Structure formats: C-alpha cells, structure tokens
Amino acid sequence: MSITLSTLLDLKKKSEKFAVMTAYDATFAYEMDQAGVEVILVGDSLGMVLQGHDSTIPVRLEDMVYHTASVRRGARNAFIIADMPFMSYGTPDQAMAGAKQLMQAGAHMVKLEGGAWLCDAIAHLSRQGVPICAHLGLTPQSVNKFGGYKVQGKEASQAQLMLDDAKALEQAGADILLLECVPTKLAKQLTEEACAPVVGIGAGPYTDGQVLVMHDLLGVGAGKKPKFVKNFLAGSDSIQAAFKGYVEAVKSGAFPAEEHSFNI
C-alpha cells in the first residue's frame, strides 16, 4: 500500500508511531520499502555520509535531484521527502524553483530548515500544492551559526521560541514538523500541540515518528556516533533484518529509549 500524507495524519490521530529513514539510492530504498519503512528522507546528510564533507553545506540542488530520482525508482510504497539544500530557498520564488525540480524527480514532499522566517516561502509552496516538512531545533545547515551540533531549546526562552515557530510554520502551510536534538519534554509538548505529524531525531520517544540516518542505524562510517543513534545491524543477520528491527522498535515505542534522549 502506498503511504500518503493522509496515511501519516491518520497514524497521528490513532497515536500510532511511524518509521522514517534516510536513503540515497534505489537499492537501499527498495530494502526499506520491503521492511515497511513508511517514510524515506532523501537527506542532504548525503554530503557527509556519501560525499565525505564535514557538513551538509556543500550539497547542491542537482545532488538532491539526482538522489531523489534514484530513491523514487527503488521505493514504490514509501512516502518520499527530499531536503532542499543550503541557500536554495531564501525567497519564495527560489524555493518554488527548487521544489519543482525535486517534486518532478519523484519527491512527495520537500523539507526546509528554519523558523518563522520560512513562513513566506512555505505559504507560497503550499498555495501551489507542494507538501512541506519544516525542520526545527538543530538545523544542520546552520551549524556554523550554532557553533557546532548542539541541543537546542534548553533554555525557557529558546523553548518558547521553538513552540511559537512551530505554530507559525504550521499555520503557513507546513504539513509535517521535524525536530532535531531537542529536550524530550519540549518535543512532547510540541507534538501534543501540533495538528501536523511530528518526526523526531534526538527528540525523545513522544514524537509521532522517528528518523535515523541509514549509515548511523547500520553502524557504518568514521567518527563518534551521536547520543540518539542505535546500531540496529548489531545482532541482526542482514541489513533487511536491521531495517525491520528498527521499524518494529519505533512502532512499539522501544526506540528511542532514555539513553538516546536529552532529558534536560
């Protein structure tokens, strides 16, 4: 069965969790589809895990279009979200031009990083029938402004700003919200207040969906893994089994556990 935005809204209404994973090619997208992953994110994380950069900033729109098309050819049932890369949505018209390419490549939704300043671009896209995911909290394209990959929303003023931004973005037309590296308590409140499905990564167990970068989930790649990551390949006899284990853990609420969350 093909997953649609309506499917995800129904899951939220029924308080049923859904699993999200990143993919960048047809083969792994197919395996995720077979494992029951509801949503595949074609992430600009490809800049780090595929291209070897130390951030997502060097990723180009043409990179995202290429990998989105590859994923679409492999996944026939999953709902596909494609990241809009750094500096590709500064104005509504610029956002529309990029979204057009990604949607024509096979995306069902595009993702933008930022707060309420995105509202004009989101409203413009929404009026034209483009589904949008708004990414809040730790937004990797702003890593240089943050001074590193740090938990966001720890202070009361930061938390309130994030809640206000989420409401503004949803009112502007955001269909899904994604929270990265935010305290569990804040993510829980935001998820309860939002009508849109909320996906978390490093945001505790109370969001409607969970997302992990595929390479992190499989325990591959150099460097120390973030606190919110779990290696699902360890103890599994295949990549397919690891993907299924992740889906089951998300749906049952077993993942993320307290050890993967920021209880601040």
Curated annotation (Swiss-Prot):
Pfam families: Pantoate_transf. GO terms for biological process: pantothenate biosynthetic process. 3-methyl-2-oxobutanoate binds at residues 44-45, 83, 111. Gene3D superfamilies: Phosphoenolpyruvate-binding domains. SUPFAM superfamilies: Phosphoenolpyruvate/pyruvate domain. Its main location: cytoplasm. Its EC number is 2.1.2.11. Belongs to the PanB family. Homodecamer; pentamer of dimers. This is 3-methyl-2-oxobutanoate hydroxymethyltransferase 2. It comes from Hahella chejuensis (strain KCTC 2396). The lineage of its organism: Bacteria, Pseudomonadati, Pseudomonadota, Gammaproteobacteria, Oceanospirillales.
